[in-house]
């Protein structure tokens, strides 16, 4: 592979999509209250509880996805999904809205629903800061039937509070609608996101697309001249050929006998890190069950170690239905006919949404700051210490972490780099 090409792109399309049976232009009996974006000073008082709630939600989502299909590649952004669910809840009322938002902020149930939306602004602001640094791209897009009129307050609120892009589109011809949505996403966001929408219900009048893209530039590059084809051991019966990247340097390393796994942390520019966790041979299923609970301890015990790192690179484009998973983490009504929206004339409403997450990591992206301390990370010629060999040639986990907040921006499970 030539110098400068991406070594790893993992993408997952998690199907979630908004279907409304009947959208009315009539005045609603219950209008939503205006939400004032919360300031950092107001966030401070609730920050500790919000952080615990966010981590609990991300952990439940992680465990649910693992149990659902442990032998499948997976990638999702808990931050982005949290924002999308909060956005959808703005279109709900009564118990349905309370159920959706309470799952995100479990310990803040005594607060008004609108105060909870203000509390969630810390996630929105964090993504906006990353976008300013051109490290991350995040967008929620509502495609709405131009032949129907929606409650204008709803549109104003989702735009103002969660910065949602609203696109009016003709839903009469579903095939043309699918093509139009897919073309818009490909042209405006990501050309690799082809055929994002594969099915639209005949009654669909609204479709939500949630997109999040991370472009990680490693501070210390892989040695591109050492990349070559090698075996990746999916299991005892399945072996696939992948491009294996290599580098030897001082690295952030951790070993857990409790989790039976090894961790390597690779800093990226602009306060983000790629964290790779490699379960021991034959211990992948054990790590699946214990990862959510024991990973934090693994990261706390890290140290600088001279290591010889080998990591598989490839591209995966995955698709999975998501709405049957949400009830398992406590969101029971949002995708059923029990959902009540203040945008409809009937109580029968079905909701779905599309979450498209992409990670791109360049193997050669040495930044200026990293160049200054490259002598610190490189292995001295006269060093007698034997490097620890860490070879990601079997199923592993990948996390993208924000170094300032310690939140997971992305969570990924690479089971087979050659399958979708």
From Swiss-Prot:
Q: What is its main location?
A: secreted
Q: Where in the cell is it found?
A: Secreted, Extracellular space
Classification via Gene3D superfamilies: Alpha-1-antitrypsin, domain 1 (2.30.39.10), Antithrombin, subunit I, domain 2 (3.30.497.10)
User: Glycosylation positions?
Assistant: 225, 271, 343
Q: Which SMART domains match?
A: SERPIN (SM00093)
What are the UniProt keywords, alphabetically?
Glycoprotein, Pregnancy, Protease inhibitor, Secreted, Serine protease inhibitor, Signal
Molecular function as annotated in GO: serine-type endopeptidase inhibitor activity
Residues the record marks as site: Reactive bond: 381-382
Q: Could you tell me the Gene Ontology terms of the biological process aspect for this record?
A: female pregnancy
Task: Give the signal peptide as a residue range, or say none if absent.
Answer: 1-25
Q: Which family is annotated?
A: Belongs to the serpin family. UTMP subfamily.
Please identify the protein, giving its name as recorded: Uteroferrin-associated basic protein 2
Record organism: Sus scrofa
